[in-house]
Swiss-Prot record:
Species lineage: Bacteria, Pseudomonadati, Pseudomonadota, Betaproteobacteria, Burkholderiales
Reaction(s) catalysed (UniProt annotation): L-aspartate + NADP(+) + H2O = oxaloacetate + NH4(+) + NADPH + H(+); L-aspartate + NAD(+) + H2O = oxaloacetate + NH4(+) + NADH + H(+)
Free-text function comment from the UniProt entry: Specifically catalyzes the NAD or NADP-dependent dehydrogenation of L-aspartate to iminoaspartate.
HAMAP family per record: NadX
GO molecular function: aspartate dehydrogenase activity; NAD binding; NADP binding; oxidoreductase activity, acting on the CH-NH2 group of donors, NAD or NADP as acceptor
Pathway per the UniProt entry: Cofactor biosynthesis; NAD(+) biosynthesis; iminoaspartate from L-aspartate (dehydrogenase route): step 1/1
Family: Belongs to the L-aspartate dehydrogenase family.
Protein name, UniProt field: L-aspartate dehydrogenase 2
The enzyme's E.C. designation: 1.4.1.21
GO biological process, one term: NAD biosynthetic process
Enzyme class: oxidoreductase
Amino acid sequence: MTHRIAFIGLGAIASDVAAGLLADAAQPCQLAALTRNAADLPPALAGRVALLDGLPGLLAWRPDLVVEAAGQQAIAEHAEGCLRAGLDMIICSAGALADDALRARLIAAAEAGGARIRVPAGAIAGLDYLQAVAGRDDAEVVYESRKPVAAWRAELPGMGIDPDTLAESRTLFSGPAREAALRFPKNLNVAATLALAGIGMTRTRVEVVVDPRARGNQHRIQVRSPLGEMQIELVNAPSPANPKTSWLVAQSVLATIRRHLARFTIG
């Protein structure tokens, strides 16, 4: 069976995912993308990914699955229409879901259209554990994001920090996951994913650190409850095309697509 998969956005993540799907002969796919600029299409995908004209064009193409990888604004613009039309979605820009009102509208749209929303793990691990403790009032979750200067180069000057002279680690934020995800939409989607899987946007605590000595994009997750403790530390290689995101993210999205299409899944 050939699956029809449409992307919203065709940046570093979506391009890597599209290439992975096209290389998988065991799971043939037809691909299309809704993107603001046709020049976004990498040469390797030219002629293999159809370019769509706005949300009407996407709906007319009738995909089996829509993969959003264009940023939080794209969710506000396109997700509700896709879901009401009955199109299952994978949402990569999970930070948008920190907005309770938007999340409620998307869930209502999915219910109206008979569609499903999936959020990939992305750069992190341990979501199954967080889901297991989600209902406990006595659970504590702390997440630390520690990234090198390259991941924050565009934002640091606005915080009064010179990225070229920063020699020591600096804490950029400490607070609840909701605020982290909405304040840093290009860097903290992970915070929203953790909170949605676990104990919520308010109780999930987030520390954001820029560290010139960081070996890569580092993620530390600590969970404590009477059920036990979990500590995870990941050191992900940054994406060659976008240092704000981990190279692993595209593979996580690809795995989520394969689970969505599969008859047999684990986890």
